[in-house]
Swiss-Prot record:
Belongs to the ATPase epsilon chain family. Produces ATP from ADP in the presence of a proton gradient across the membrane. GO terms for molecular function: ATP binding; proton-transporting ATP synthase activity, rotational mechanism. The keyword Signal does not apply. It is a peripheral membrane protein. This is ATP synthase epsilon chain. InterPro entries: ATP_F1_dsu/esu_C_sf, ATP_synth_F1_dsu/esu, ATP_synth_F1_dsu/esu_N, ATP_synth_F1_esu_C, ATPsynth_dsu/esu_N. Keywords: ATP synthesis, Cell inner membrane, Cell membrane, CF(1), Hydrogen ion transport, Ion transport, Membrane, Transport. SUPFAM superfamilies: Epsilon subunit of F1F0-ATP synthase C-terminal domain, Epsilon subunit of F1F0-ATP synthase N-terminal domain. It is found in: Cell inner membrane. The keyword Transmembrane helix does not apply. One of its GO terms (cellular component) is plasma membrane.
Amino acid sequence: MAAITFHLDVVSAEKKIFSGRVETFQVTGSEGELGIFHGHTPLLTAIKPGMVRIVKLHGEEEFIYVSGGIVEVQPGTATVLADTAIRGEELDAAKAEEAKRRAKENILNQHGDMDFAQAASELAKAIAQLRVIELTKKRR
């Protein structure tokens, strides 16, 4: 029996990152983790910085880092519109580690609520990038 699929587009302000048929995808929404399958109820929600895990035909996985944005689900199609989207294999582990180190340093040396919020956001983004890199390497 053939897998039931739907169309998914992952786009950023710069370019289309992914377009194709998928069995499912997961993303971090504003209220928690979302798993989207064919036939999902229509949905429009904000997404947090993190990973889009795409399961294509035959269980093949792809991981994409997103810095935030929105996800829209309609019958037979879904779109992830990200502020920034980068395929796992295109992420730079050294840059992500350095961003993580700087963010931790900024949290320790913060001078107000705004500094802390910005540093915490940068730390979350760096950790998400490192997680996508890790999962992409495991897949190979």
